[in-house]
Amino acid sequence: AREQVFKTTTWGVIWIPISSGTSGVIREMAISRSDPNTLYATSGAAIYKSTDGGVTFASVTSGLPGRTITSVYVHPDSANVAVITFSGFGAGKVYKTTNGAASWINISGNLPDSPVNDVLIYYPGVATNVYYAAMDIGVFFTNDYGATWVELADGLPNTVAMHLDYHQATNRLRIG
């Protein structure tokens, strides 16, 4: 049962499995805001995509490094745009698709060789080219779709950043 996606329409009172499962434990999942039938789920180094609300999944892992995927984020305006991050060391920390995961582009740019734990597309109600990456060595941002990354150091402790959250109504970024 742990390899399945579950759904509730009763605020968590009743949960119904909606998928036949993946080949492993689901680590991360993201649902498109613009098309709720599109969702991505990760399992280890694999990523799967569903376009039928999670009933069926197809692997969209081709062309990606063989490391554990640590996060997936779908652009609020387009189910075809998603960004994923990887653990471990070596080239290729952040990848992006603009064609619904038919192909992936390495947008790691000049990121340091350290695991990336989370990613967020900054979206204050209009499309931007700003992304944030939470890493084992701090938080980095890009304003050119990943070509160059800059560390956010002012006022932040030198510590592991595991999670990013953006609240659009207050325009606040939270880091955990």
Identify the meaning behind each predicted range.
Residues A1-G176:
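Extracellular glycan-interacting surfaces
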